Amino acid sequence: MTDLQKVDPEKYAAVADNFVYVHRALRRDLDRIIEGGEELFQSDFPRFARILEKHSELEDQLFFPALEERAPGVTRDSDDQHQQVETLVTDLATGKCNDTAKSLLQLRELLHSHLEEEEQKVMPAMMDHFEAAEIWALDGRIMEFCSPEFMQEMLPWWFEHIDAGDRVCVAQNMAVGVPEDFLPVLCQWIAAGLAESEWAELTEKVPALKIPTPS
């Protein structure tokens, strides 16, 4: 358990999806792409770029403006870093980098530094300046920014690139925060990214996910 979890487990759970579990998936997927060489870069980097872009958009348009109203200036460094990361990702995605492998390593260094800064500065500020219910309310607005097509791509990716413990935490949050009539759809998308045994393990620990029967 981290220090932030010990201080306020309820608030930590509310911010962790966007500032812990997505971050871990981004790190792991980028590491995988780097280790996989040119072929994997060509096939999988476009998806990584789309998901990272949307993640940054959600911060820039949803979470950061709300936080700036209560803690002016706290997200300034993250805003600047978003621009640096976006520029390098765009150059990689459009073939403008002369040395793809070297540029990917630069991206990893920049991205890791950026994510750590958010986890050490922005995430604690969210917990300091918002009640858990307010954070959940912001989280509940994510679908305003995400198309069903994006969510269908993102959810399998997310659950594939976090470990079993993180899957349980994210799934528990979804089981509570997602409308009951939409939960079966999300479950189908999540299951698409997992092996049958992994899905069985997850539904055993989060029974609410047993509503649908993935094929």
What is the role of each PLM region?
Residues 1-215:
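Small-residue-biased structural context
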